[in-house]
Amino acid sequence: MSVSVQQILGFLRAVAPQELALDWDNVGLLVDAGQPVDGVLTTLDITPAVVREAVENDCQLIVSHHPVIFHPLEPRDVPFQLVQNGISAICMHTNLDAAPGGVNDTLCDILGIAAEGRESFAEGCGRIGTTMPTTVEALAKFCAATLHSGVKYVNGQKPVTCLAEVSG
């Protein structure tokens, strides 16, 4: 059963309204190839390899977190590859970061930041709140293992009871 790009966009906007995006962010429908959608590929970034994967898997739509268009385009750029292959693209960036239940709230849940009293900052792109007491060292190890992130500095035994995170 095919659906339209506009139907999918409507659903995504209900989850992460475009009004939540920062002024500079280019979110929403960035390429509309006009094709009915039977297959959707989701990704962090749209690259030439992702476009090839969409073609190989007969996907008519790619939904990405990071916008595929920020600057003037040239024929070799990914948006042209999307159009040439009849693939539409929807990007949900800072609006999905800021949306209730979006990227920042998900990170808070992973990090154990309490939902009660959780506050938004940085125009919705960050959250701050309390957490169960831990040490910087234990938190760094947890983040490295859970989020597959590197650790830059650890002063191991300082207590942590409040965390702030920014998804971008």
Segments predicted by a language model, with ranges:
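Hydrophobic structural segments
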Residues: 1-168
